[in-house]
């Protein structure tokens, strides 16, 4: 049995695992391993869990003979450090600060966490990150990028998105959000420094 584990909180992990196992049993999906040990993850599961070509997956086994594939996020591995770093940046900048990988919000400070934490990022934000674009915009601007998949957050009108790059690979972004204050040169330099620091942390 293959159990696909999304990189989420434990409650969502349990619920999603149950749903995916039920889905596999209900549809009767079976995949054979080829002579190189490869197995195809069905397109439906890849779409649901946002697994893309080239995404790293961790492989685990348990005592019952199950093989567990877990999406790997280098930024997510920072855990408490990412949370503390977001808090420090929020205090320094005076803005809502988010640290994201290419799937979801990993850490947030300066705002109601329920509004952002562990929420999926929007396809537009994922595209901007992958293109390594630095975005400074206000709602209504042509280059404004919604942060969340559903974009129901109304606590910000201005944004500054700075990609995190490590060893040539883009891993996520540092995001500053503000309700009424436009981002300037100071915020830009702070975000660049913060993104560079996190990128170096990933190399260790």
Question: Where are each of the predicted segments found?
Answer:
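Short, Lys/Arg-enriched N-terminal segments with co-localized hydrophobic residues
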Residues: 3-23
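Short beta-strand-centered segments at strand-helix junctions
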Residues: 37-49
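Juxtadomain coupling helices with adjacent low-complexity linkers
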Residues: 79-88, 119-126, 172-173, 177-204
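Short regulatory alpha-helical segment in sensory/regulatory domains of signaling proteins that mediates
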Residues: 86-92, 97
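Short hydrophobic alpha-helical segments used for membrane anchoring or interfacial signaling
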Residues: 96-108
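Regulatory sensory and allosteric helical modules in signal-transduction proteins
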Residues: 115-150
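A short, aliphatic-rich beta-strand micro-motif
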Residues: 158-165
């Amino acid at each position: 049995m293959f159990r696909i584990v999304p990189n989420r909180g434990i409650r969502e992990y349990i619920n999603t695992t149950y749903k995916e196992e039920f889905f596999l049993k209900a549809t009767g999906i079976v995949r054979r391993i080829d002579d190189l040990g490869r197995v195809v993850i069905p397109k439906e599961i890849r779409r649901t869990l946002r697994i893309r070509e080239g995404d790293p997956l961790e492989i685990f086994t348990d005592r019952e003979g199950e093989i567990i594939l877990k999406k790997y996020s280098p930024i997510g591995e920072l855990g408490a450090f990412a949370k503390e770093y977001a808090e420090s940046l929020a205090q320094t900048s005076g803005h809502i600060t988010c640290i994201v990988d290419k799937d979801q919000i990993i850490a947030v400070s300066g705002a109601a966490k329920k509004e952002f934490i562990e929420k999926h990022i929007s396809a537009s934000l994922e595209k901007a990150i992958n293109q390594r674009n630095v975005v400074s915009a206000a709602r209504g601007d042509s280059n404004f990028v919604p942060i969340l998949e559903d974009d129901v957050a109304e606590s910000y009108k201005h944004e500054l998105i700075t990609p995190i790059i490590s060893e040539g690979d883009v891993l996520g972004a540092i995001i500053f959000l503000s309700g009424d204050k436009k981002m300037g040169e100071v915020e830009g330099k702070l975000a660049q420094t913060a993104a560079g620091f996190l990128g170096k942390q990933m190399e260790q």
